[in-house]
Design a protein with these regions (language model features):
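The two-metal-ion catalytic cores of nucleic-acid processing enzymes
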Residues: 240-258
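Metal-dependent phosphoesterase core characteristic of DEDDh/y 3'-5' exonuclease domains
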Residues: 1-19, 38-151, 156-159
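Acidic catalytic cores of enzymes that act on phosphate-bearing nucleotides/polynucleotides
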Residues: 158-237, 241, 246
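Metal-dependent phosphoesterase signature
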Residues: 15-32
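Generic detection of long, well-ordered alpha-helical segments
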Residues: 26, 30, 54, 132-135, ...
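A broadly tuned preference for mixed-charge, low-complexity surface segments
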Residues: 21-26, 97-116, 178-203, 258
Length: 258
């Protein structure tokens, strides 16, 4: 670590890594990310994690960029890809729940915290948030999912790439798709039937969809009202007005679509 900046005390408490220990056994950031990149960039491999696309991958990208390395290439070059088991696990809960013990939170909804899932299913996890323990736990959860429904597991794995998931999209016929996302909430098992309506005007990796579980009345509203409500948070909308049931899906982030 650099001597001019100390880690947050809460981070030290969670990891058990003090500045003294990091200085004694750690690596400079540039050397550290070089070793990480060498592993992740192995040709024809898939980087898999649990909530990794929204969290771990973003940290890895930033570290690569800060060390003057390509932050994106290892994700898609040389036959490489990435996959995230969080939404895969949500898909299993909604579509194929049998064979897995699903922990329940205080609010009555399923907990998808990795440490809760491993505890409920008798999987050794060691110290939660310890990197190696989390890796082993993620592998064991993947094994459990595949054992419970190999067909669904393999289908979602095959559809992890932008090219594969793009093949499901039919804008001419407005073919509905099943989509799993944290945006839909636990009350809906994080699942919704959506219909793709258009590609994003400036990002060809982003698909614009309408949530068929919500009222389509907004389609009758003037474009100015739609635009105003689309970019207004729920708390700022008038009473009785819900956010528009429009969602974008980033096809290069291994979304769950069926």
């Amino acid at each position: 670590p650099t001597p001019d900046r100390l880690p947050h005390p809460a981070a030290i408490r969670v990891t058990g890594i003090t500045p003294q220990l990091a200085a004694e056994q750690g690596l400079p950031e540039a050397a550290f990310i070089t070793r990480i990149h060498q592993e992740l960039a192995q040709p024809k491999t898939c980087g898999i994690g649990y909530n990794s696309i929204r969290f771990d991958d973003e940290i890895t990208r930033f570290a690569l960029w800060r060390s003057l390395r390509d932050p994106y290439g290892r994700e898609w070059q040389n036959g490489n890809s990435r996959w995230d088991l969080l939404d895969v696990t949500r898909a299993f809960r909604a579509l194929r729940p049998a064979g897995i013990e699903w922990p329940v939170r205080d609010d009555g909804f399923t907990s998808f915290r990795l440490e809760d899932l491993t505890a409920a299913n008798g999987i050794e996890h060691g110290a939660a948030h310890d990197a190696m323990a989390d890796v082993v736990a993620t592998i064991e959860i993947a094994k459990l999912l595949k054992c419970c429904d190999e067909h669904l597991f393999d289908t979602l794995y095959r559809q992890r790439t932008k090219r594969a998931v793009s093949a499901l999209v039919n804008l001419d016929d407005l073919t509905p798709l099943v989509h799993v996302s944290g945006m839909f909430g636990g009350a809906r098992h994080y699942l919704a039937l959506v219909v793709p309506v258009a590609w994003h005007p400036t990002n060809n990796s982003e698909l614009i969809c309408v949530d068929l579980g919500k009222s389509p009345d907004f389609l009758e509203q003037p474009a100015e009202i739609v635009r105003e409500h689309l970019f207004t948070s729920q708390i700022d909308l008038p009473d009785g007005v819900e956010r528009l049931p429009i969602k974008t899906i980033r096809l290069n982030r291994a979304p769950v679509l069926l």
